[in-house]
């Protein structure tokens, strides 16, 4: 039980007078609304009352326990309960959280998605970066597919980020089952029209999308001046799709596998998602979601496209610096 406040000078003076008048302890307690124990302690030694220091409150965790808590939380997805049980501590979950917060080096952070990379993937990414340092990125059409859900973007994943360490990542498969799939593309100066596609799109479907939008766009430019960027999804690199590119004389950018962090359209998708789901908006029907996507796509200003494309050189530098490992873009 917490201790009450010390008697004030006025209360002490009242007690001194009441003691001279032989007022009972019970009556003193009633008159000044203080406990009999408090009054008794004062009357026992009025001179030294209030001069002794209270013993400091015992800490729930020792210094060693706190170090173990920080070590257990470091770059992990453990909850405060998990950490408490793992270390067999009697402290509350709030105490565990306070220790982590006071550490100054661990914060709650969302897991950053990144592909699983083999040594060969990293080597190909590194080679791509070195070979394309002089590429004119304003002449590249960047493309990708994106999934949207009626009830908002995919769930967030958070963990205890140790600021002294590299951020953790999580890996996920493409096309895990959504409600609306779109194909999009853009250049430094222009967004191509969004195309709604099937999540089970095959090579022929993909070629139809390219014919409908990419070929229409390239008709206004010299094809030899432009290169088309796509990832290495099966329908993108199938024999029939390769034949289509040859027939249409569309030059391809030799893109390294598992490299969404290199593609600025991933950042454009992020901008689009924030607009589509602004203020935690959800959509009752597929039709309303599609309209929301179209409206959001049109609202993105062209000056943002230029800054995204111009980030390519910085991305390549980061790939070289990290020797092909995932980069934070």
From Swiss-Prot:
Name of this chain's protein: Transposable element Tc3 transposase
Domain of life according to the entry: Eukaryota
Pfam families registered for this protein in UniProt: DDE_3, HTH_Tnp_Tc3_1, HTH_Tnp_Tc3_2_like
Stated role: Binds specifically to the terminal nucleotides of the TC3 inverted repeat. Its expression results in frequent excision and transposition of endogenous TC3 elements. TC3 transposase acts by making double strand breaks at the ends of TC3 element. The excised element would then be inserted into a target sequence.
Biological process according to GO: DNA integration; DNA recombination
Keyword Nucleus listed: yes
Gene, per the UniProt record: tc3a
Residue ranges the UniProt entry marks as DNA-binding: 2-135
